[in-house]
A protein has these predicted regions:
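Electron-transfer interface patches adjacent to heme c in soluble/periplasmic c-type cytochromes
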Residues: 4, 16-117
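Short, charged low-complexity linear segments at domain edges
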Residues: 1-12
């Protein structure tokens, strides 16, 4: 659908856009192999199997928080960790980024709800 394609392209632009005080992009952590934060391996969304494994396991129960969380919440928290401006819940930007990630995870089987640290 043309609107979905437009959303994907905006999400892709956002995924690679660098900004904030650390000049990070989503791709800084999720666009290459071998990235980790503390003990957590980070998925490379440029590889379908990585994207599928990551995207299809949300919503998830976050043990550290004792709560179910959505992919959109995960993006909000990632933006916070990057010191980026707050990504508004249900904003067009958040929907575009989720659309991009969902397309990258195409053909993955849902494996939710999952349990995350």
């Amino acid at each position: 659908h043309p609107k979905e394609q437009e959303s994907f392209l905006r999400g892709e632009k956002m995924f690679f856009f660098k900004g904030g005080p650390y000049d990070f992009a989503c791709a800084t952590c999720h666009g290459v192999d071998g990235q980790r934060i503390r003990l957590q391996d980070l998925p490379n969304f440029q590889k379908a199997d990585n994207a599928q494994r990551a995207f299809t396991t949300w919503p998830a129960y976050r043990v550290s928080q004792g709560a179910m969380r959505t992919m959109q919440w995960r993006l909000l928290d990632c933006f916070r960790q990057q010191r980026m401006p707050e990504l508004e819940f249900l904003s067009p930007a958040s929907i575009d980024l989720i659309t991009y990630m969902g397309v990258k995870a195409k053909d993955g089987a849902m494996d939710a709800p999952a349990i995350k640290r």
